[in-house]
Amino acid sequence: MTDGILGKAATMEIPIHGNGEAGQLPEDDGLEQDLQQVMVSGPNLNETSIVSGGYGGSGDGLIPTGSGRHPSHSTSPSGPGDEVARGIAGEKFDIVKKWGINTYKCTKQLLSERFGRGSRTVDLELELQIELLRETKRKYESVLQLGRALTAHLYSLLQTQHALGDAFADLSQKSPELQEEFGYNAETQKLLCKNGETLLGAVNFFVSSINTLVTKTMEDTLMTVKQYEAARLEYDAYRTDLEELSLGPRDAGTRGRLESAQATFQTHRDKYEKLRGDVAIKLKFLEENKIKVMHKQLLLFHNAVSAYFAGNQKQLEQTLQQFNIKLRPPGAEKPSWLEEQ
């Protein structure tokens, strides 16, 4: 009955056998992270209720907390408010029940995959792209960290050059016999300081752009990837459940459960395929955006650094103009907070 449905999937199911390959799986901390990811989607209940009896109990078994503090001796029939309270408690019980069943199935599926007793659906091409994105993000984070370190060093160098230029200028006024030597050294330090401020502005722009790419664009795509991975786990959990029911005996009771399981499986399959498509689209747009952004930023970084160490002040200023980077005029005071508004 399910062969037609399962055969249409664009992905493949990779069986995992307990023949010793389980030793190559990730460490236990990775398993704990996956289990936490399964458990984070628990229900959010605004009101607390106590459930008496088992799952098969009636709605009367739901007792709102606080109702037993002052027991009433009145035998008057229940009013509309009591019926509403029972209805709300029943809905919350259903939410908790569904969440518990879903969590149990997903945890069972996850453990089955990890210990080599189950199969998982894998889109090989998409999984490769996701792993490549995570590796790229780690490398870009390293570049971002180094860029911030370079910014800090440049700022410290500028402060030292500025102080050294002031010291040379002061000594030029107080040492007539060395006035010329102190004078041109002071001018050299001031020129280096000016070019350094221009370079610092370019590096700051470079770091800011990479930070946006890593913490905004890439992170947004990875959030969708996490949703996709959770949907994949749910899909496989309900697929396994449907397969087990299909292999069991067929009677009147089983037929109803099989139809219900098939409907639930189809819902999770649709969710999984939708998120798989979303991830593929976001990965494509992310790659295009990354190439566009980094082409501009790497050109800026190369031109600015080359011009600075070549002592080409004109080319350095032209580089900032080319990328529309504006700096405060040399010697200008920092504007007040009111002027910045």
UniProtKB/Swiss-Prot annotation:
Phosphoserine, modified sites: 72
Subcellular localization(s) per the UniProt record: Golgi apparatus; Golgi apparatus, trans-Golgi network membrane
CDD domains, per the entry: BAR_Arfaptin (cd07660)
Gene Ontology molecular functions: GTP-dependent protein binding; identical protein binding; membrane curvature sensor activity; phosphatidylinositol-4-phosphate binding; phospholipid binding; protein domain specific binding
Region (Disordered): 46-84
Phosphoprotein found in the keyword field: yes
Biased composition (Low complexity): 65-81
Function: Plays a role in constitutive metalloproteinase (MMP) secretion from the trans Golgi network. May have important functions during vesicle biogenesis at certain cargo subdomains, which could be predominantly utilized by secreted MMPs, such as MMP7 and MMP2. Also involved in autophagy by regulating the starvation-dependent trafficking of ATG9A vesicles which deliver the phosphatidylinositol 4-kinase beta (PI4KB) to the autophagosome initiation site. Involved in phagophore growth during mitophagy by regulating ATG9A trafficking to mitochondria.
Subunit structure of this chain's protein: Forms homodimers or heterodimers with ARFIP1. Interacts with RAC1. Specifically binds to GTP-bound ARF1 and ARF6, but binds to RAC1.GTP and RAC1.GDP with similar affinities. Interacts with ARL1. Interacts (via N-terminus) with IKBKB and IKBKG; these interactions inhibit activation of NF-kappa-B.
Name assigned to this protein: Arfaptin-2
